[in-house]
């Protein structure tokens, strides 16, 4: 593990109890009886509330459904992993040699969980307001333009609304292949419409590849 003081500097928060920070950085593969899963559980709840309250005030005229989509676009593994990478969090996480050799320090799930655990740890030590301040600073730094149109990239829904309205057809998404090692698995998805391939995309998850394919299709249709 690197010097955790560097991580504290990036967080702009110095832990009084260094063991609490180390606890938040301990993956279950390193020590089953002493890992960050409980702190992750707490941090997840804190972040859910922090982001929910933030969006409630920032998008004062938006309906509940739109706010829920916005929160889902921010409170997820991919977004939290991005923030974790900005902190070089993988360098500080304690994990087994086997997990590290399997790409553990780059896994979005592990990075995201560690970030949540750190926020949970700050909440335990300093209270909600401290955790809120730090969480919002990290979110705004990594997502400087928090805009509904940018965050809610639900291209699949938009495409389906267009195709159903114009030709009464629903796009179908077929998995062409899955390839790569387990920790870097890639999926190739073909978007089919009325029996013809309209677009194709590759991404690290089926859902992401489907969204990318839908975006390509929308661009072809001139709907973006």
UniProtKB/Swiss-Prot annotation:
**Coiled-coil intervals, chain numbering:** none
Q: Which cofactor does it need?
A: Mg(2+)
- Alphabetized SUPFAM superfamilies for the sequence: dsRNA-binding domain-like, RNase III domain-like
Keywords tagged on the record:
Cytoplasm, Endonuclease, Hydrolase, Magnesium, Metal-binding, mRNA processing, Nuclease, RNA-binding, rRNA processing, rRNA-binding, tRNA processing
Q: Which reaction does it catalyse?
A: Endonucleolytic cleavage to 5'-phosphomonoester
- InterPro entries per record: dsRBD_dom (IPR014720), RNase_III (IPR011907), RNase_III_dom (IPR000999), RNase_III_sf (IPR036389)
According to its UniProt entry, one GO biological process term is: rRNA processing
Instruction: Extract the CDD domains matched here.
Output: DSRM_RNAse_III_family (cd10845), RIBOc (cd00593)
- EC number(s) per UniProt? 3.1.26.3
Record flagged with keyword Cytoplasm: yes
Q: Where in the cell is it found?
A: Cytoplasm
DRBM domain: which residues? 154-223
Q: Where does Mg(2+) bind?
A: 40, 113, 116
Q: Which Gene3D superfamilies match?
A: 3.30.160.20, Ribonuclease III domain (1.10.1520.10)
In this chain the RNase III domain maps to: 4-127
Subunit and partners: Homodimer.
Function recorded in the entry:
Digests double-stranded RNA. Involved in the processing of primary rRNA transcript to yield the immediate precursors to the large and small rRNAs (23S and 16S). Also processes some mRNAs, and tRNAs when they are encoded in the rRNA operon. CRISPR (clustered regularly interspaced short palindromic repeat) is an adaptive immune system that provides protection against mobile genetic elements (viruses, transposable elements and conjugative plasmids). CRISPR clusters contain spacers, sequences complementary to antecedent mobile elements, and target invading nucleic acids. CRISPR clusters are transcribed and processed into CRISPR RNA (crRNA). In this organism endogenous ribonuclease 3 and Cas9 are required for correct coprocessing of pre-crRNA and the trans-encoded small RNA (tracrRNA).
The entry sums up its family as follows: Belongs to the ribonuclease III family.
Protein's UniProt name: Ribonuclease 3
Source organism of the structure: Campylobacter jejuni subsp. jejuni serotype O:2 (strain ATCC 700819 / NCTC 11168)
């Amino acid at each position: 593990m690197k010097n955790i003081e560097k991580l504290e500097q990036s967080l702009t928060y110095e832990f009084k109890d260094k063991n609490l920070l180390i606890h938040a950085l301990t993956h279950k593969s390193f020590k089953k009886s002493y890992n960050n899963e409980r702190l992750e559980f707490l941090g997840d709840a804190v972040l859910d509330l922090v982001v929910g309250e933030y969006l409630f005030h920032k998008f004062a005229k938006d309906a509940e459904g739109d706010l829920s989509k916005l929160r889902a676009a921010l409170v997820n593994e991919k977004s939290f992993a991005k923030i974790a990478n900005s902190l070089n969090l993988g360098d500080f996480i304690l994990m087994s040699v086997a997990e590290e050799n399997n790409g553990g320090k780059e896994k979005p799930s592990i990075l995201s969980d560690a970030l949540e655990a750190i926020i949970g740890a700050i909440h335990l030590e300093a209270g909600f307001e401290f955790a809120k301040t730090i969480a919002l600073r990290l979110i705004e730094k990594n997502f400087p333009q928090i805009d509904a149109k940018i965050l809610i990239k639900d291209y699949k829904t938009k495409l389906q609304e267009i195709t159903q309205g114009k030709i009464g057809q629903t796009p179908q998404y077929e998995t062409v292949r899955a390839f790569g090692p387990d920790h870097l698995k890639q999926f190739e998805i073909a978007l089919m419409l009325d029996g013809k391939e309209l677009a194709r995309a590759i991404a690290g998850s089926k859902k992401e590849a489907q969204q990318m394919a839908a975006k390509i299709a929308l661009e072809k249709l001139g709907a973006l």
